[in-house]
Amino acid sequence: GVEGWDIPDGYLCPPIPGRADYIHHLADLLAFGNDGTIPLGHSVRGLDVGVGASCVYPIVGCHEYRWRFVGSDIDAVAIESSSRIVALNPFLAEVVECRLQPSSADIFRNIIQPDERFDFTLCNPPFHASPQEAAAGSQRKFRNLGHSRGEKVVLNFGGQANELWCEG
C-alpha cells in the first residue's frame, strides 16, 4: 500500500484504474522497442509532466514496473503534496523526484537538466480549453443523463484551474 496518500482539498482526485491503464499501455509501447519485453527496473526513467498533488503515475509505475520518475508541475502545493507522498514511502523515496516548474509557459525548460535523459514522457493534460468549456461539458452530461430541469449546473468534477483547463 501507499502511506500518507492524501490530496489537498480542491485538487483533482484521479480515478486510479484509468491511470493504471495509461501506465500499462506505456509499458506495452516500451516493449515494442525492447524485443517485445516490457522493460523493468530502475534503468527505465520517465518524466511525468503535470504530476499533480496525487503523484499517481509515478506511484503506479514504480509499484508495477520499478521505474524511476521525475514529476514536474507548475503548482507549488501539488509539488509539496507529491513530495510528501514520496517521502513517506520508501519504495518511492529513492526513485521519484518532484520538481517545480517556475514558468507556466515552459514544459521541459527548467525541468530537464543538461545531459539528463528519459525513456518516456507522459502527461494527462487538462480536458478543457476554458472554464466555459468545462461548464458546457457538465451541462451536456447532465442533459444526457436526463437531469435537465432548468436548475443551475455546477461542475461535476473538482480540481484546480491548471488541472482542468489550459489554452491549446
Model-derived regions: residue spans:
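Conserved class I S-adenosyl-L-methionine
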Residues: P39-A53, V70
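Conserved SAM-binding loop of SAM-dependent methyltransferases across substrates and taxa
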Residues: A53-W67
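Conserved AdoMet
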Residues: G1-F32
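Mobile active-site "lid"/loop adjacent to the S-adenosyl-L-methionine
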Residues: P125-G168
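Short, glycine/acidic-enriched loop or turn micro-motifs at the edges of active sites
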Residues: V51, A76, F127
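Extended hydrophobic secondary-structure segments that form protein cores and membrane-embedded regions
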Residues: Y11, R45-V51, C98-L100, T121-L122
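S-adenosyl-L-methionine
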Residues: S72-C123
